[in-house]
């Protein structure tokens, strides 16, 4: 079987779309690729998308030029981890602190990140 090429997308379901999009755009520097009242799609690097869905807005499916997207809606806590280079970690820690964001924990994984 051929290996998986990469993670295509991560979807988060948010109550406050403007606030969530502003965080990922203004604090983390992700570029907005597409935006609508139900979805903001952002470039998360390496051909990966971060999708922010307004909670409850995806209970009905949607027709797209690429095909039918079935209904979905996330519930409960979620976890997303972004990789940064070891040399860049102090800069990211300072940037997050400048925006009042507390770091719960720093973990170094043997596989990177």
PLM region descriptions:
Residues 18-19, 87:
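Short alpha-helical
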């Amino acid at each position: 079987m051929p290996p998986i090429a990469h993670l295509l997308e991560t979807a988060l379901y948010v109550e406050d779309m403007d606030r969530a999009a502003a965080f990922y755009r203004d604090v983390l520097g992700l570029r907005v690729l597409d935006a609508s009242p139900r979805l903001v799609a952002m470039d998360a690097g390496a051909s990966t998308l971060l999708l922010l869905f307004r909670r409850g807005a995806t209970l009905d499916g949607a027709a797209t030029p690429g095909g039918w997207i079935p209904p979905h809606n996330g519930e409960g806590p979620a976890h997303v981890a972004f990789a940064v280079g070891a040399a860049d970690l102090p800069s990211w820690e300072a940037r997050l602190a400048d925006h009042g964001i507390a770091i719960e924990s720093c973990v170094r994984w043997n596989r990177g990140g």
